[in-house]
């Protein structure tokens, strides 16, 4: 192969970003090849969508497979390139020969006679080029892959925390409104309690905002630390072989920092404060035996908008689909068309339940879709070890403590109002904004819906 052809061939093995032989090369959808670490570092802080650094075309898939053939050729090119090993620092003082071998046991560069000495005879020795390539593949690339994975996880958690913060701001504003409406229904002497309640909500919300902001700072710092460590390993990777191997003892010490615990996301939860006398007032409208004792097997499914609010980005793989585990539902024997009605349901023994009122026409269905169309439900769900409480009309996460015992439901048909209460605390869970009812509404309770 003539020198011009060889030069062209070698250029095909060089990344246009770092201008070095490829490290773990990948090929994008637009058929351009780059080092995976270079592509990661150029990916605009890891945000989607991924764009090609050369043509700026958006890649359809965020993850790319290693170009194995290109990786092998680049590795061979690195091992066969001229080694700058004839410097005075790389001459054995004892034998005055060039150190061309690397001792795996002692992590030292050796000349030929030293490698055959009694001290090193039993050890494994490798040529410098081969040993440096092994270090790159077995240590640096694996550590960089691990650090990038942690980087991506932390970035996703940071995005979630930012989303929670924005959602919580709106939720707190909304909760102020529904608390104010609830107190307006009560006697004038409760005004002072209402103000104390709102002030406590402000203080608690301020603490939660601070916790979320602190969490964002911690995650950002953790993210930057991982990126800095990743860059250090990337720079170490590109060191000349001799410097790299002389620095190999420090690699493990630096990468040990990557094992530090990741900052965990905050679970914002507001206290449900007791509203004096609310249960006494509601019991004036109590409906005895509101729900039938006869359980009907059914399948529950959540509409797309409800699933998105409850389960976030993972809503497509979340539970509660029509082909899932069979659930059991009970309805009230009576449908309401006017007046005020209050009843209580025990949810002690179920983590997954749906409670509220629905149109009377739905009672004949065994496949029930929970949406936001004239149904008013409180939904408790458990995914892995995470519990969530939400409502469906419109779909909304409830940032309050999940009730663990009896839940009270108050239907004010004439004023278009449905509210939920935590009976053990005498506190408000949520009150739907007033609307207009035009069809009969029937109490509904479903449990075991996973």
From Swiss-Prot:
Q: Which UniProt keywords apply?
A: Coiled coil, Metal-binding, Zinc, Zinc-finger
Asked whether the UniProt record includes Lipid metabolism among its keywords, one would answer: no
In this chain, the RING-type zinc fingers fall at 15-56
Q: Which GO terms describe its molecular function?
A: ubiquitin protein ligase activity; zinc ion binding
GO BP annotations of the record are: innate immune response; regulation of gene expression
Q: Coiled-coil annotation: which residues?
A: 191-218
Put simply, this protein is called Tripartite motif-containing protein 64C
User: What is this organism's lineage?
Assistant: Eukaryota, Metazoa, Chordata, Craniata, Vertebrata
Q: Which gene encodes it?
A: TRIM64C
């Amino acid at each position: 192969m003539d020198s011009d052809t060889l030069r062209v061939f070698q250029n095909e093995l060089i990344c246009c970003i770092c201008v070095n032989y490829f490290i773990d090369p990948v090929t994008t959808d637009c058929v351009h090849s780059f080092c995976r670490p270079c592509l990661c570092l150029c990916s605009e802080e890891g945000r989607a969508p991924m764009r090609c650094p050369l043509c700026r075309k958006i890649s359809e898939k965020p993850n790319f497979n290693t170009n194995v053939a290109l990786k092998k050729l680049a590795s061979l090119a690195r091992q066969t390139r001229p080694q700058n090993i004839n410097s005075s620092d790389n001459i054995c003082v004892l034998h005055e020969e060039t150190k061309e071998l690397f001792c795996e046991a002692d992590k030292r560069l050796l000349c030929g006679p030293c490698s055959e000495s009694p001290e090193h005879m039993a050890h494994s020795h490798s040529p410098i080029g081969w040993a440096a390539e092994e270090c790159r593949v077995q240590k640096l690339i694996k550590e960089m892959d691990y650090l990038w994975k942690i980087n991506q996880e932390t970035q996703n958690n940071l995005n979630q925390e930012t989303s929670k913060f924005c959602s919580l701001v709106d939720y707190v504003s909304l909760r102020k409104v529904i608390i104010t409406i609830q107190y307006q229904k009560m006697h004038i002497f409760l005004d002072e309690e209402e103000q104390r309640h709102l002030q406590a909500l402000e203080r608690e919300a301020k603490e939660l905002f601070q916790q979320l902001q602190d969490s964002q700072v911690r995650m950002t710092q953790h993210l930057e630390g991982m990126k800095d460590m990743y860059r250090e390993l990337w720079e170490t990777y590109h060191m000349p072989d001799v410097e790299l191997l002389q620095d190999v003892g420090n690699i493990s010490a630096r990468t040990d920092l990557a094992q530090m615990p990741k900052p965990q996301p905050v679970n914002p939860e507001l206290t449900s404060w007791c509203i004096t006398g609310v249960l006494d007032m509601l019991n004036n409208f109590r409906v005895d035996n509101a729900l039938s004792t006869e359980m009907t097997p059914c399948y529950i499914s959540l509409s797309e908008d409800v699933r998105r609010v409850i389960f976030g980005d993972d809503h497509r793989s979340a539970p509660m689909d029509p082909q899932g585990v069979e659930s059991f539902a009970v309805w009230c024997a009576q449908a309401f068309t006017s007046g005020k009605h209050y009843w209580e349901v025990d949810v002690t023994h179920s983590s997954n339940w749906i409670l509220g009122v629905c149109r009377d026409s739905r009672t004949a269905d065994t496949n029930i879709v929970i949406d936001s169309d004239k149904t008013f439900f409180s939904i408790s769900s458990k995914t892995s070890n995470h519990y969530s409480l939400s409502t469906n009309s419109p779909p909304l996460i409830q940032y309050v403590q999940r009730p663990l015992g009896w839940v009270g439901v108050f239907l004010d048909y004439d004023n278009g109002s449905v509210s939920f209460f935590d009976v053990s605390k005498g506190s408000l869970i949520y009150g739907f904004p007033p609307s207009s009812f035009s069809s009969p509404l029937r109490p509904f309770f479903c449990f075991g819906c996973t």
